[in-house]
Amino acid sequence: MPIGVPKVPFRSPGEEDASWVDVYNRLYRERLLFLGQEVDSEISNQLIGLMVYLSIENDTKDLYLFINSPGGWVIPGVAIYDTMQFVRPDVQTICMGLAASMGSFILAGGEITKRLAFPHARVMIHQPASSFYEAQTGEFILEAEELLKLRETLTRVYVQRTDKPLWVVSEDMERDVFMSATEAQAYGIVDLVAVVE
């Protein structure tokens, strides 16, 4: 039996009675954002809207983006990354579970020194993929050119965010490279690994 999104009580300032809101809406009020699915236009637009709204509401208080994502579409992922760089508050990124593909790109996009992975989290980088098998020859060539541009963009951002040499990142993006939390820290995708006490 599906339970849906859990509801929690929330009382707005000045109100006597609490109302029931879904848990994510309650957490958004604490500036806690979640990417817990494949990256697509819908979740990208939701996160961008929340980051912009919360940065207008208070431009000095950090935002926290929790990531557990298998990756997804490149352009919506880059839009999230660009918004993280654009908003005034620092965006802290936290990897819980998996940050693969665009998930790891967004994870690396957090404020440097404020990117964290849980101890058993996994991170994966690779090159962007395409749907070549669906394209005809002319479209195939145009799509290949666009894919090369996107790959170059992603590679340069990883180089900038990790301080790894271009040749290392380029070589690693040739295939799926999975990392533990400590390996992702050594690579420069995250700055800290959470410690369980």
Swiss-Prot record:
<dbReference type="GO" id="GO:0009368">
    <property type="term" value="C:endopeptidase Clp complex"/>
</dbReference>
<feature type="active site" description="Nucleophile">
    <location>
        <position position="101"/>
    </location>
</feature>
<feature type="active site">
    <location>
        <position position="126"/>
    </location>
</feature>
<protein>
    <recommendedName>
        <fullName>ATP-dependent Clp protease proteolytic subunit</fullName>
        <ecNumber>3.4.21.92</ecNumber>
    </recommendedName>
</protein>
<keyword id="KW-0720">Serine protease</keyword>
<dbReference type="InterPro" id="IPR001907">
    <property type="entry name" value="ClpP"/>
</dbReference>
<keyword id="KW-0645">Protease</keyword>
<dbReference type="GO" id="GO:0004176">
    <property type="term" value="F:ATP-dependent peptidase activity"/>
</dbReference>
<dbReference type="InterPro" id="IPR033135">
    <property type="entry name" value="ClpP_His_AS"/>
</dbReference>
<comment type="subunit">
    <text>Component of the chloroplastic Clp protease core complex.</text>
</comment>
<dbReference type="InterPro" id="IPR023562">
    <property type="entry name" value="ClpP/TepA"/>
</dbReference>
<keyword id="KW-0150">Chloroplast</keyword>
<dbReference type="InterPro" id="IPR018215">
    <property type="entry name" value="ClpP_Ser_AS"/>
</dbReference>
<keyword id="KW-0934">Plastid</keyword>
<dbReference type="InterPro" id="IPR029045">
    <property type="entry name" value="ClpP/crotonase-like_dom_sf"/>
</dbReference>
<comment type="function">
    <text>Cleaves peptides in various proteins in a process that requires ATP hydrolysis. Has a chymotrypsin-like activity. Plays a major role in the degradation of misfolded proteins.</text>
</comment>
<dbReference type="GO" id="GO:0004252">
    <property type="term" value="F:serine-type endopeptidase activity"/>
</dbReference>
<keyword id="KW-0378">Hydrolase</keyword>
<dbReference type="Pfam" id="PF00574">
    <property type="entry name" value="CLP_protease"/>
</dbReference>
<dbReference type="GO" id="GO:0009570">
    <property type="term" value="C:chloroplast stroma"/>
</dbReference>
<dbReference type="GO" id="GO:0006515">
    <property type="term" value="P:protein quality control for misfolded or incompletely synthesized proteins"/>
</dbReference>
<comment type="similarity">
    <text>Belongs to the peptidase S14 family.</text>
</comment>
<dbReference type="GO" id="GO:0051117">
    <property type="term" value="F:ATPase binding"/>
</dbReference>
